[in-house]
Amino acid sequence: MTIQVLVVDDSSFFRRRVSEIVNQDPELEVIGVAVNGKEAVKMAAELKPHVITMDIEMPVMDGITAVREIMANNPIPILMFSSLTHDGAKATLDALDAGALDFLPKRFEDIATNKDEAIRLLQQRIRELGRRRIYKPLSRAGATAVPASARAGLSSTSPTLGSSTLGRSPASGLASSASRNSPTVSTPASAIRASGKQYKALLIGTSTGGPVALQKILTQFPASYPHPILLIQHMPAAFTPAFATRLNGLCQIEVKEAENGDQLKAGCAYLAPGGMQMMVERTGSISRLKVLAGSSDMNYKPSVDITFASASKAFNADVLAVVLTGMGADGREGARMLKTSGSTIWAQDEASCVVYGMPQAVAVAGLSTHSISLDQMAEAILKESGRG
């Protein structure tokens, strides 16, 4: 079944360009265009598209207000277009709070090294959102997400997982023979027995859907959380400072954008800067972060694989690593190294993911002990960390 798309933008050029790109994909079809948020709300109710692409700054009604109204009345997956500025980052985070599921920079040259890559990325994001479940927006305090049925007839299949090296594989499918032996069925937090391990760090890696998921989890942590927390969220460099500031204002724990040389301390979360790689090194009892540009051929900056791999060397078996919602397979190879070192790996379950790519890759590879609903992830982490 074709994924039907509503394009919303006050720029006639951008409406036309996005429509052309969408219609180039045989799996996608533009069924309507709107020039402002008010039109978008009306057309969303009438046309019932599978996905909406939405600008933020528009006359009559802005994109954030439109997202709130659509998600309150006719929940539909929404992909925001944003400028890579401080104000653009804040507005995009507001849109995600309101219920939008993902975002892309409005300037295509900001998201790709060439035209073909930009086209592929936009089409891929729309396909993934059109195939997934949608959720009512979380409140700023992290209220429970409410699942809604996906469109009938839309396939949720993904490409088969292939071989990869750290941070380079975008594949996100499943191998059926492996999945039969993997913990992909959701485990309630109440059924998880604390292992009693003395962890040195909590690591959380995520991509699409991650900002809302991280907010939901971290706002439930007490200021006395006993371990440092390393957060790896696929996000442009212009966005991570605003995201760290937002989380810090909402959470009892401290949240900051990671800086080179930061000494890790309990009860503090360090967000990997966009466009950089975050690694951890340990000398005696002191653990510090290294924040570097890294190799130019890496698909992800920051990369979950890179941070996980460094933690496996620094902390051996003393890591609790969690892979949340996200497109691709980043985190799988780093999780493999952590697993080999004896660390504990968990994944978010399929039903609560915006995109079940990264957690699926880890679960299907047999690396995760449990797949856990986003609603219960904080409870499970706190229990395992000795705070439950």
Curated annotation (Swiss-Prot):
The segment(s) forming the Response regulatory domain are 4-121
CDD domains from the UniProt entry: CheB_Rec (cd16432), REC_CheB-like (cd17541)
Pfam families, per database record:
CheB_methylest (PF01339), Response_reg (PF00072)
Molecular function terms, GO-annotated: phosphorelay response regulator activity; protein-glutamate methylesterase activity; protein-glutamine glutaminase activity
What processes does the entry annotate via GO biological process terms?
chemotaxis
Ranges of compositional bias, category Low complexity: 153-169
Q: Output compositional bias ranges, type Polar residues.
A: 174-189
Catalysed reaction(s)? [protein]-L-glutamate 5-O-methyl ester + H2O = L-glutamyl-[protein] + methanol + H(+); L-glutaminyl-[protein] + H2O = L-glutamyl-[protein] + NH4(+)
EC category name: hydrolase
Post-translational modification comment from the UniProt entry? Phosphorylated by CheA. Phosphorylation of the N-terminal regulatory domain activates the methylesterase activity.
Catalytic residues at 207, 234, 330
Q: Answer whether the UniProt record assigns the keyword Phosphoprotein to this protein.
A: yes
Chief place of localization = cytoplasm
Q: Which residues carry this modification: 4-aspartylphosphate?
A: 55
Q: Which GO terms describe its cellular component?
A: cytoplasm
Kindly provide the name given to this protein in its UniProt entry.
Answer: Protein-glutamate methylesterase/protein-glutamine glutaminase 1
Gene that encodes it: cheB1
